[in-house]
Swiss-Prot record:
One of its GO terms (cellular component) is cytosolic large ribosomal subunit. InterPro entries: Ribosomal_bL27, Ribosomal_bL27_CS. Belongs to the bacterial ribosomal protein bL27 family. The gene is rpmA. It comes from the Bacteria. One of its GO terms (molecular function) is structural constituent of ribosome. Residues 1-26 are annotated as: Disordered. It comes from Prochlorococcus marinus (strain MIT 9211). One of its GO terms (biological process) is translation. HAMAP family: Ribosomal_bL27. This is Large ribosomal subunit protein bL27. The keyword NAD does not apply. Pfam families: Ribosomal_L27. Keywords: Ribonucleoprotein, Ribosomal protein.
Length: 88
C-alpha cells in the first residue's frame, strides 16, 4: 500500500499569450504611411481606399492621412470598411 498519497493530474494549467488584436488607430486620427490600423484574425473589417492588407489580415495605411470608418452593405451583411483620407 502507498504510504503517501499520490498527486492527481489536472487538465487545466495552460493559458495562451494574448495576441494584442484590435483597432490601433481610430476614426479621425492622423496616421503615417505604414502605420498599423487594425490587427485582426480574418477580415472582420475590410480595407478601403489607401489601406493595404497583410498576410495575417492586418490593415495598414498606404499613405499619410486621416483614418475614416464607414459601414457598407456587402451581400446580406453590413460590413465595416476603413480608409485613409489624404490630407491636403
Amino acid at each position: 500500500m502507498a504510504h503517501k498519497k499520490g498527486t492527481g493530474s489536472t487538465r487545466n494549467g495552460r493559458d495562451s499569450n494574448s495576441k494584442r488584436l484590435g483597432v490601433k488607430a481610430y476614426g479621425g486620427e492622423p496616421v503615417t504611411a505604414g502605420s498599423i490600423l487594425i490587427r485582426q484574425r480574418g477580415t472582420s473589417v475590410l480595407p478601403g481606399i489607401n489601406v493595404g492588407k497583410g498576410k495575417d489580415d492586418t490593415l495598414f495605411a498606404l499613405t499619410d492621412g486621416i483614418v475614416t470608418f464607414e459601414t457598407i452593405r456587402r451581400g446580406l451583411k453590413n460590413r465595416k470598411r476603413i480608409s485613409v483620407a489624404l490630407t491636403s
